[in-house]
């Protein structure tokens, strides 16, 4: 039910955002990290791109996403399609995110892409 989901998001996501920024502030104050990565649902939908230095998009084709959701979470194919229908289209992520990680080539290749992207990010600071 879209109305219930919208109400749930309106309740939870402002609190999630507050907690994310509370934790970021604590890490900054303690000088614990060279950079901070945040992974959360609805980052673009909630306007986080205005708060972070960079946004990354981890991409995998639809068939692989469905396969992983079915295997990892036990979802039906119908449930997978319902979830994906509520998400922003891939084009939006590709437009708004400065880095795209292709996650269909296996863990090793994904790790290499992330390592390269992190090194590139760190070279800027």
Label every model-predicted segment.
Residues 1-34:
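ATP-dependent small-molecule kinase phosphotransfer cores
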Residues 3, 15, 43, 63-64, ...:
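Short alpha-helical
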Residues 5, 17, 37, 62-66, ...:
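A general structural signal for well-ordered alpha-helical segments in protein cores
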Residues 8, 37, 101:
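Residue-level signature of catalytic and energy-coupling elements of molecular machines
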Residues 9, 66-70, 81:
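Amphipathic alpha-helical segments within well-ordered protein domains
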Residues 19-20, 49-51, 71, 75-122:
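Small-molecule kinase domains that catalyze NTP-dependent phosphoryl transfer to phosphate-bearing small molecules
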Residues 21-72:
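ATP-dependent NMP and nucleoside kinases share a basic, alpha-helical "lid"
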